[in-house]
Amino acid sequence: MRYYLLMKQDDKIRIYLFFGISGSGKSNVLFKFLRQKILKERRHDNGKMTEPPYEVLSFNSFNICAGEMCRKICRMMSVPCKAGISKTPKDYSYRADKTYFVDTSRKIGDQKFVYDFFSKSVFAAKCFLAVPAIIDLQILSGILEQYSFLKDFQVVLTFCDFTNDKKINQISEFFESRKIRIAARNNSGTIDSSLEVL
């Protein structure tokens, strides 16, 4: 297997991976986190960013519109986007001076393929599982079972403005009892946290 990596020795390529069942809001979360990163970068750089240190990789080939939507949002944010690499990720040129945001397919098998690929030692990957806060508690165990291939991940609760604090607290307790960290809460307008720096 070949990797085309433009990197210094001992550097790892930073990757943020977003997983979740169909309709969980994972792509929405990805772009909100990316926007936070861009705004933070511009604040520290006096509003200038010659080349964005970020890139979006879309593995979402299940829906024909998903890649196009991803490209359009990236154009609006002035961030490079590569869609359609789901079959040949090993042939892509990854750079250690960039951080990659990975949008995954809705199919669990495809998500596992992406996770396995970016679990290799040349990558420093951080995984986030988008979980709708409106979901029934009895279904959460099944979702965790589906994503048992994720060895180290954090949860982002989505659709928080479509439920109440009691339900959110119940879901939070569910994850806390399993020692799974909730990284952020997402609603229609904002996300209440930012990704930890790799």
Give the role of each language-model region.
Residues M1-I13:
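Extreme N-terminal, non-catalytic leader segments
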Residues V29, F33, M69:
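Hydrophobic positions on the alpha1 helix immediately C-terminal to the Walker A/P-loop
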Residues D161-L198:
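Canonical P-loop GTPase G-domain recognition
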Residues G25:
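Conserved glycine(s) of the Walker
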Residues K112-I135:
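Inter-motif core of Ras-like GTPase G domains
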Residues S58-S61, C65, M76-S86, K98-V114:
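Switch II (G3) loop of P-loop NTPases
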Residues S22:
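The conserved Walker
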Residues F19, E41-A66, I85:
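Short beta-strand-centered segment that lines the nucleotide-binding/catalytic pocket of NTP-utilizing
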